[in-house]
């Protein structure tokens, strides 16, 4: 049975459990149990702190794990990156009090920076040739400048609202981060087979994101024009109707261009346009 390490709470926990659910892998999300087994898939879920996940996977306590890229890089554990999952996106940034004039990263020479990510920060500053004092703290990094503990901070930024509420401004983006699926380097053949099945399901879910299934009635006289503006997966499905002068066209559209394309279709005479979301898409 495959064992996956998952963050025990927070946004990454929510996003991971949603992905498992959409892949029809049923798992209890009880906060009182650290190890639970799926009721319909050969998978155990081990709930851990996010900073413990890289080591648990590298050591073989867990076979695979979902972890923020920021934690994976910071810990430097020897595990494989299997897939980028595209959710729980954030960035690691340097921030300083907003009233301070900032002229570049050399401002941090001789300054004290508070962070929970000393390794990433140290490597970045060495690359930039900046000598600074790194003060490691594990929580509430953003209050450090306000209480005189540091001149600036290096921390996770999502919306930036926490920085604003603490009178700080972002001055350097050091790295972008998203959820990663990582794996132990020595998985057995059976576990790799289970992993491949899970990845197949994940891909079907991810491929369906921001896609719409569109059905419409179109005049046959303009059918080729309409086909030419459809950026479907391959060729759209054409179905004859009782009225010989009309046919039904089925296709898949990307949400990013949905309204642009729908407008063109209406101009070309498409009618009865029906739009439905797609749960999963197997290419």
Can you annotate each of these PLM segments?
Residues 1-43, 69-80, 85-91, 99-283:
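Small-molecule-sensing regulatory modules
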Residues 37-55:
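Active-site-flanking structural segment that lines cofactor/substrate pockets
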Residues 51-56, 61-78:
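Pocket-flanking alpha-helical
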């Amino acid at each position: 049975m495959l064992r996956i390490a998952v963050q025990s709470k927070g946004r990454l926990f929510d996003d991971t459990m949603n992905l498992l659910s959409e892949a029809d892998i049923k798992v209890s999300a009880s906060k009182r149990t650290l190890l639970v087994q799926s009721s319909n898939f050969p998978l155990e879920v081990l709930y851990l702190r996010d900073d413990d996940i890289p080591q648990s996977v590298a050591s073989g306590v867990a076979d695979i794990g979902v972890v923020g890229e920021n934690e994976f890089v910071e810990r430097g554990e020897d595990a494989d990156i299997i897939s980028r999952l595209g959710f729980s996106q954030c960035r690691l940034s340097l921030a300083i009090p907003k009233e301070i004039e900032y002229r570049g990263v050399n401002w941090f020479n001789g300054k004290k920076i508070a962070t929970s990510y000393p390794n990433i920060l140290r490597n970045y500053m060495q690359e930039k040739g900046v000598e600074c004092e790194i003060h490691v703290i594990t929580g509430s990094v953003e209050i450090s400048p306000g209480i005189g503990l540091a001149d600036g901070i290096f921390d996770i930024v999502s919306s930036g609202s926490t920085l604003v509420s603490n009178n700080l401004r972002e001055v350097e983006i050091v790295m972008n981060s998203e959820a990663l699926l990582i794996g132990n380097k020595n998985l057995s053949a059976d576990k790799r087979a289970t992993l491949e099945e899970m990845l197949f399901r994940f891909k079907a879910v991810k491929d369906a994101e921001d896609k719409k299934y569109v059905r419409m009635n179109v005049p046959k006289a303009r059918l080729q024009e309409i086909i030419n503006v459809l950026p479907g997966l391959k060729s759209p499905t054409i179905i004859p109707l009782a009225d010989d002068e009309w046919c039904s066209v089925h296709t898949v559209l990307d949400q990013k261009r949905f309204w642009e394309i729908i407008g063109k279709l209406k101009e070309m005479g498409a009618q009865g346009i029906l739009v439905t979301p797609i749960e999963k898409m197997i290419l």
